[in-house]
Amino acid sequence: MASARNGVSKDELLPVYERRSQRDGDISGSVKSFASTIGNSASAAVLAYCLSSISMTLVNKYVVSGASWNLSFLYLAMQSFIGTVAILACKKTGLIQNLALFDLKKAQTWLPISLLLVGMIYTGNKALQFLSVPVYTIFKNLTIIVIAYGEVLMVGGGVKPLALLSFGLMVLSSVVAAWADIQNATTATVGASSDSTAAALSALNAGYAWMGTNVIFSASYALGMRRVIKKTNFDNWDVMFYNNLLSIPILLLASVLAEDWSSENLQRNFPAELRQSLFIGILYSGVAAVFISYCTAWCVRATSSTTYAMVGALNKLPLAVAGIVFFAAPVTFGSVSAIVLGFISGLVYARAKSTGA
């Protein structure tokens, strides 16, 4: 009472360390409250998913777009190694709490899926090397069609009318994109030698061939993973960990056998003036692959699978626009029409998934 009469508060009578502990507890509580708010925010989840997936595609395009680039297996091995280290670091710090210990038997069961993943990411990077980001994005929609009919063959059932309409729009957008690409290639080489035109068309044909192969690998990976994941009882982080870990020796072996590791070739692939930015891109892509996996689960948890499907459809447009902005992809009536058709097809497909029509 005397202290109160003398104008000294109760808090001032507490020992310094107790007041500091109380203050730190208040700050910690505020941080946890803010983190909880963000974690349950649908807007934050959608934004994080969109930014991570767009940036990942753009960084991959940047790394593999060098005129002399021919070390895709090595690049992907580095990416997988960085992803594995990032996952283990997250587990060590407590950010990931449900990652099980490595199981050799489960690894053997999962190995065929990792082989399909290697095929998927390698062919995807090769397609990006020859095709523009908008065209790559549009053709990627074809994977949805192959998966849908693969599921029909595996589990029966059929494809509903609205889904069929979306598939038709996807095919049409791909045809328009290819037509616009070929028109641009021939127009850009007008006045040049016939060899230049032939080289441009040859590069496009290589890109389409890699894209077609990527669609097959992507669909096979998705369909195979759904079957094997039931046997292993993996969650999202287990899938990410085993995919990255098992891919490393496969990719390294493929790189040693198929790629040139001479100092001259390494110099051509990583020129001194671009070396730092390329390595930053490789580091980012490895970490971003883990972040995309987290954001996918976050988006589904904070919203719904229907909203996630819709976001995936809407994400095609900013990704295509980003490709035009950052890599100067040609803007023509054909290319814009293909992007719009691809965007609409994604919306129709998301609607078909949500209504079952």
Swiss-Prot record:
Q: Which domain of life is it from?
A: Eukaryota
- Glycosylated residues, chain numbering: 184
Please give the GO cellular component terms listed in this UniProt entry: cytoplasmic vesicle membrane; endoplasmic reticulum membrane; Golgi membrane
- Which residues are exposed on the Lumenal face of the membrane? 55-68, 129, 182-196, 258-277, 328-332
Q: Which UniProt keywords apply?
A: Cytoplasmic vesicle, Endoplasmic reticulum, Glycoprotein, Golgi apparatus, Membrane, Sugar transport, Transmembrane, Transmembrane helix, Transport
Decide whether keyword Transmembrane helix is in the record.
yes
What Pfam family is a match for this entry?
A: UAA
What is the topology of this protein in the membrane according to its UniProt annotation?
Multi-pass membrane protein
The regions listed as transmembrane in this protein's record are 34-54, 69-89, 108-128, 130-150, 162-181, 197-217, 237-257, 278-298, 307-327, 333-352
Which subcellular locations apply to this protein? Golgi apparatus membrane; Cytoplasmic vesicle membrane; Endoplasmic reticulum membrane
Q: Name one GO biological process term.
A: transmembrane transport
> Which parts of the sequence lie on the Cytoplasmic side of the lipid bilayer?
1-33, 90-107, 151-161, 218-236, 299-306, 353-357
Q: Per the annotation, which location comes first and is thus the protein's main one? A: Golgi
Q: Which family does it belong to?
A: Belongs to the TPT transporter family. SLC35D subfamily.
Q: What exactly does this protein do?
A: Involved in the import of GDP-mannose from the cytoplasm into the Golgi lumen.
Summarize subunit and interaction data from the UniProt record for this chain. Answer: Homooligomer.
The protein's matches in PANTHER family, at most eight in alphabetical order, are given as:
SOLUTE CARRIER FAMILY 35
Tell me the protein's name.
GDP-mannose transporter 2
Protein source organism? Neosartorya fischeri (strain ATCC 1020 / DSM 3700 / CBS 544.65 / FGSC A1164 / JCM 1740 / NRRL 181 / WB 181)
As recorded in Swiss-Prot or TrEMBL, the protein's gene is named gmt2
